[in-house]
């Protein structure tokens, strides 16, 4: 069997070498590694190397185009029969690569419009098999993604979905359109093409072991990497394209958990024996750490994953289908002639999961949302899960949310933002975009808010390890307890980041609300109008009484009541206005403080995860029960200090207090505006009363001064000049003018 790896990647520059090589081959390898070019084509580096094959990365200096070329170096060490088989397989792969040109999820062959360069490529080695020219994928492979520190316990749900969706399409295309069974599916053979926007496209590659798949089963040699091939391959050698479905299931489990599902550290014999007899719904097999002769069938995912609860539940049900040991059941077709494995996967890939962070409970919530779901349905679920009163719930959308604001007509599906499911550090780095950790924040709004911080829980395995319950300290057990502890550390880091982000978003939301709501402008406008009308009425009444002392236009009690009401409402308006201004200043200060806190927290390794990962997973240090216990205690101390002495303790309460007072002040504004309306009516009635009294009085022979003619009123900045004379007809006109202003102003909308 000849294995050539071509995971075309700029990441992790090491060369992967498979197969045994003689000293002669090693010398040739060193010679071939010398970087040289041909024309405009620069040879960048070797991507993959085997005993017979080589994959090279090239870049065109003029156009910037990048390609990968796959070669057979020499076949002299093979028998004539082996050379024929290799040639047949090679030419099939060459032809297949040309079939993939228009399919986005398979690495395709490409054309080179440079016959001299193509001739050079074909003449590089003694083997006369034609070069295979392929598109170059610049983002590494999925194996490298699984090996990154943030993915030690599996990938994020977003990336899992993206990879499974791409692999499902690639396999269905190969099986149904090309009649090809890949036979060597594994994370190493799923490569990544990263676009200029940083987004990733996943592509299946390496068809060195692929063969045509007739409808009937066929006897084949055992190929593929042992942890990914189906039990029937080893059991009897009879298999068909359903072996790819099994490998698909193994990859799916590994993507989610970071581990292989079926006792990978055990002997091949133990693995196969347990696979053959496992129940249909079993999705993993583990070794009992207290009895290494006992193996346990698992029907649920381990808790150390990064999936949302609703999606994890559906994923677990689906996973039993591709991991069914019975290949006939595994390959069942749905009504549309698509394998049930693919049809059921399509359903869960279409699930929309709304992510929420309940700040008062310091808890992440996740709900599957659909077009039929209402906000009432969502609120009922939140109340059930948090124990908060529905009337006390306050929703805050992240600043950049496309829905902008929640209205009575909003639906939960409108709050879902698909791209925000991608919260990985890798995406943040390449897309230059930092998605919020959730799609919605919820808070409790009342005078004294309740706060609860859930306690992190060490796995049972870790607790038993610390208590020295295990006689054996095998490497797999060491690694598992380290991964369990790392999961606790990373989850707590993520929880604290969500808490701080929520506090920051609430401060931003309050500031925006205060700036957008024109309460101060409304109060100022009404205060100016009322003050003007009151001053006009006072001047008019004073002059009228001076000119007609014998006639009392209004009673003293009526005037005192008006004066008392006027002074009260003006003072109330000033107080409310002053408080609103103070709230806005405080909100701006809170925004500055929480912006800085959020930046610091997101850039800091709060619980020293990197050191822990490097020491025990990169450098392979052996962890003892006492060391694990010490790490757990240090984590507990750091966590206690953060939640009880850090800014995240007092900031929420300060914002709570400000929000509650602002909320109560908002409730008083409609009352204030109604009081403005009421006093307008009072002034209107007094003006009307004066008008009627003046109309019944014989007009005195007095002339209005020029100041009366200059009286001007506007809704923007009303003004008037005092007058020193009064005639009945002018008194009526003046009263009517004031009345008209008040009538018009009483028609304004109130909050």
UniProtKB/Swiss-Prot annotation:
Keywords: Antiviral defense, ATP-binding, Cytoplasm, Immunity, Innate immunity, Kinase, Nucleotide-binding, Phosphoprotein, Serine/threonine-protein kinase, Transferase. Residues 489-510 are annotated as: Leucine-zipper. It catalyses: L-seryl-[I-kappa-B protein] + ATP = O-phospho-L-seryl-[I-kappa-B protein] + ADP + H(+). Residues 41-341 form the Protein kinase domain. It is found in: Cytoplasm. ATP binds at residues 47-55, 70. It is an enzyme of class 2 (transferase). Disulfide bonds: none annotated. Gene3D superfamilies: Transferase(Phosphotransferase) domain 1 (1.10.510.10). The active site is at 184 (proton acceptor). The keyword Phosphoprotein applies. Autophosphorylated; upon LPS stimulation it is transiently activated, and can be autophosphorylated. The modification Phosphothreonine is found at residue 225. One of its GO terms (molecular function) is identical protein binding. Its EC number is 2.7.11.10. PANTHER family: IKB KINASE, INHIBITOR OF NUCLEAR FACTOR KAPPA-B KINASE SUBUNIT BETA. Belongs to the protein kinase superfamily. Ser/Thr protein kinase family. I-kappa-B kinase subfamily. This is Inhibitor of nuclear factor kappa-B kinase subunit beta. It comes from Drosophila melanogaster (Fruit fly). The gene is IKKbeta.
